Structure formats: C-alpha cells, structure tokens
Amino acid sequence: MWDNKENHDVVGEKNECVCSGPFNSGLYAAMLQRGDVKGVFVGHDHINDYVGKYFGVYLGYSANTGFGTYGLSGAEKDRMRGARVFIIDQDDPDHFETYMVRASDYGI
C-alpha cells in the first residue's frame, strides 16, 4: 500500500519497516469476505502513523502513545508520540473520520 500511496489515499508517515507476522493467517481475506469491516488499526510499529484504503478496508497505524519506548532519534525522538482519534457518527457508522493528536499538541 505504501509503495502505491496515490492509489490508496495514504496519509501519514512511515518511518520504519512494517512488522507483519511470519505467515498469512487469512485474516484480511476473512474481513473482505464479511463485507462489513471498515478498517483495522494497529500500533505496534511505534514510528508509523499512516492510513490508507486497501480494497475498501482502511488499514492504519496509531503511533507510539508512551514515553518509555523507542521513537524517532535525536531532537525528533518524541515528535510522533500521540494517539489516533476516531469520529464515528452513530447515525452513519459506515463512514468515519480519523486523525492523529500529538502529545506535543497538549504541551506534553
């Protein structure tokens, strides 16, 4: 998805390799088959925060939320710390908004 950002409406940053599992479990195929999965968001890769749409399912990251783990290096080390916010309208749950907020936005 990252290598074809323009085709998948990717926004955000990729600062480290994707840490996917060692085998294909079929989870993504099962989500597609269900037809009602809107997105899957993870946070394991601490310095990635991008999101894009892949065959109708949003796949995305929330960057590192804590301060006791690795981040970017040097003066940038805490720049990506924060959390992903989701806004879901209960009257239209098929559509949502998501964005990152940074600890630095709150003086942390």
What are these regions (language model features)?
Residues 10-19, 25-36, 46-108:
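Binuclear metal-dependent phosphoesterase catalytic core
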